[in-house]
Amino acid sequence: MTEAKTPRRRNLLKGAAVAAGAISAPMIAKAQTGPISMRWQSTWPAKDIFHEYALDYAKKVNDMTGGDLKIEVLPAGAVVPAFGLLEAVSKGTLDGGHGVLGYHYGKQNALALWNSGPAFGMDANMILAWHKYGGGAELLAKLYASIGGNVQSFLYGPMSTQPLGWFKKPITKSSDFKGLKFRTNGLAIDLFTAMGAAVNALP
């Protein structure tokens, strides 16, 4: 990132709670000379639809600023692994990130409240409303601070609860989950682990 006389930066994490998009970018404290360049990374592969969302966002920002702000969005793994994005943005290794808040579940499990969880509780639009009008944004800032997250999160792009899954054998009773290899994230990790599933928390 090109900077002139910017001794201190604060990184913003633009996150997609309950959704699939978290974007991070630093706020510049003083005036810049020339275009500002930012390097972001997503938690998604290059061909993933959610990575395309991040690219679309960056293009809109670039166009709106008339080229004064140039955001480059890299795919997952280009600089850090998907689950290393929060730390990379906090430390300034990257200027921004696009992912899902639930991916930080291992650092602070309460962050899963903003993720698409099991099939009960608030839906995605309810979570966004709670975040904006019900104190969710303030709670999120405290949770990030509790794990040393030097980021500011912006939520967008609601996603409904993830489908249960696609299985080789029919699931007809709860005991069928015992020993079953199952991919999920957020609060669903604890739920299906308690049911005996072998859960993988993959991006």
Spans of model-derived segments:
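Extracytoplasmic small-molecule ligand-binding "clamshell" domains
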Residues: 71-89
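Immediate post-signal peptide segment of exported/extracytoplasmic ligand-binding proteins
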Residues: 25-42, 63-70, 170-181
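Short, Asp-centered acidic motifs that coordinate Mg2+ and/or phosphate
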Residues: 95-96
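Short, polar/charged alpha-helical segment
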Residues: 47-72, 190
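Contiguous mixed-secondary-structure segments that line small-molecule binding/active-site clefts
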Residues: 2-3, 59, 90, 100-202
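N-terminal secretory signal peptides
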Residues: 1-7, 20-22
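Extracytoplasmic "Venus flytrap"
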Residues: 39-56, 76-80
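N-terminal export signals
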Residues: 11-31
